[in-house]
Amino acid sequence: MNAPHRDETTASHRDDGFFTESLESRDPEIFAASQKELGRQRDEIELIASENIVSAAVMEAQGGVMTNKYAEGYPGRRYYGGCQYVDIAEELAIDRAKQLFGCDFANVQPNSGSQANQGVFTALLQPGDTILGMSLDAGGHLTHGARPNQSGKWFNAVQYGVREGDLEIDYDQIAALAAEHKPKMIIAGGSAIPRIIDFARMREIADTIGAYLLVDMAHFAGMVASGHYPSPFPHAHVATTTTHKTLRGPRGGMIVTNDEAIAKKVNSAIFPGIQGGPLMHVIAGKAVAFGEALRPEFRDYQTQVIANAQALAAQLIKGGLDIVTGGTDTHLMLVDLRAKGVKGNATEKALGRAHITCNKNGIPFDTEKPMVTSGLRLGSPAGTTRGFGEAEFRQIADWIVEVVDGLAANGEDANDAVEAKVRGEVQALCDRFPIYPNL
């Protein structure tokens, strides 16, 4: 019997390294960029509050074969065959999410926190409806009705802020705006809120006008899961989150609720409403991260995240920097730089040259432009994942003060010596707390 004919194209394809060749060999430019990014993460202190460092297991799941699978629909109800194994991953992610947040329904398909919010809007609102969210200037998020965002274009977006005295959320203003504008949805949460939000008060206001309460817990979801931050439930009708940040998972989004009717609308809004096939490799990574978050050590991690943030804030205050609201209850803080006479953009760059990564950020009632700002946003999740404790974060605060004082005294073009000194000390600290030794 003759051997089956071997197609030359197939033979060539299988022998050309497609399934075996390393990234370094196949695409040296991307490999080089990836290695440089690995070096940056290893050798610099990450203080961006919305960033974290995932486990090797999460990265392995994200880089696995589930990236090949199209899976439109939901587990057990797919539009393609061959989904029996990716169904396992999504079902695990859903079940673990429900355990983490004590809720009855979870949709783990949103590709980002922004798409999770868009999914809720699609499920519960109509274009032209009124929404009430925190202004970006006060610490809100683009997707809560900011004018440049789709949420500010499709909806009549009314914005609330903070009190001028203590710079905390102005619940009386929210109540007044709700009574005046009758929004269909009130949004709690934001991207730069250092204090715990009063969800009960927000729901009370929502109920007076029959509005939905959406809690965007993207920044503090990890602390909700560990019990360090009050749960949005039973107050929220629905909650959204990213799956990175304090949850320490892959970049993605999620929607959770206890309301079955809302859950059905949300599922239809995500697929087929605003997304097609979900990213199954990312959902696998989410499942792994949620499993990690169910372990006792995750609670210990969140305890340290908060302790580190508070140590950082207190030491910065000792160094003469102002902290918005005077401190933090969470993982993040806003630093008011006006007393030092420097801007957020220049300070971000100076700290970056010293290998301390953070982001410029507007402060409440800031008069500077968004690309300039009078402040910085700092966070502790990534450093805590590395193993830093309060002592390390107090040292980091001292370095920040040193760079800021140098910038104020010397200017951007003459602060090299200070930045180089701090950069060397940062390297020594990072060497003591390595990440990804097998990469």
Swiss-Prot record:
GO biological process, any: glycine biosynthetic process from serine
EC code: 2.1.2.1
Record bears the keyword Transferase: yes
Reactions that this protein is recorded to catalyse: (6R)-5,10-methylene-5,6,7,8-tetrahydrofolate + glycine + H2O = (6S)-5,6,7,8-tetrahydrofolate + L-serine
Alphabetical list of Pfam families matching this protein: SHMT
Molecular function terms, GO-annotated: glycine hydroxymethyltransferase activity; pyridoxal phosphate binding
Localization in the cell: Cytoplasm
Essential cofactor(s): pyridoxal 5'-phosphate
Entry annotated with the keyword Amino-acid biosynthesis: yes
Binding site for (6S)-5,6,7,8-tetrahydrofolate: L136, G140, H141, L142
Keywords: Amino-acid biosynthesis, Cytoplasm, One-carbon metabolism, Pyridoxal phosphate, Transferase
Region of interest (Disordered), residue spans: 1-20
CDD domains according to UniProt: SHMT (cd00378)
Enzyme class, broadest EC rank: transferase
SUPFAM superfamilies xrefs: PLP-dependent transferases (SSF53383)
Residues with N6-(pyridoxal phosphate)lysine modification: K245
Cellular component GO terms, alphabetical: cytosol
Chain's role: Catalyzes the reversible interconversion of serine and glycine with tetrahydrofolate (THF) serving as the one-carbon carrier. This reaction serves as the major source of one-carbon groups required for the biosynthesis of purines, thymidylate, methionine, and other important biomolecules. Also exhibits THF-independent aldolase activity toward beta-hydroxyamino acids, producing glycine and aldehydes, via a retro-aldol mechanism.
NCBIfam families: PRK00011.1
Recorded family membership: Belongs to the SHMT family.
Protein name: Serine hydroxymethyltransferase
Primary gene name: glyA
